[in-house]
């Protein structure tokens, strides 16, 4: 049974990491949409700061610029809505991995044993640790760093460490140097558990 649990855990972690490219793509597209927003907003301020004399042709210029700005905002809104939907789908997958035993059962892959990293793990402890990480999947850098700092300080939960490292593939808010330090401790087997 323990070997089976280790295989499930290994398979699940591989699945988490496989989502990284999708997450990066969504973030990139969202950033592109935000750039459209920023450019449209800059254009709006530029237009509003101009003092046009009230001649027909200059009013037409102002209206044309406003129309262009509004079109940019509408396009950015649409793109952001699409990206938000993509992100929510990823988050649902993320939480599904944490909470549905059936998903683990369907993800079993015959991976070799990962040594000390998996020896103390059970399905229950893995799911509990991953669920805790899923609940902290928030857009708050300080909150993420606080979690990392706490785990680095206590060094008492290797399974939670493994899960957090996997979760980072979906959450780019954690500082990379903190992640590297934490992963190093796990690989050196310097965490308890």
Question: Where are the language model's segments positioned?
Answer:
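Short, low-to-moderate order helix/coil transition modules at the start of elongated helical scaffolds
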Residues: 1-66, 156-176, 180-193
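Extended, amphipathic alpha-helical coiled-coil scaffold segments used for oligomerization/tethering
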Residues: 2-10, 31-135
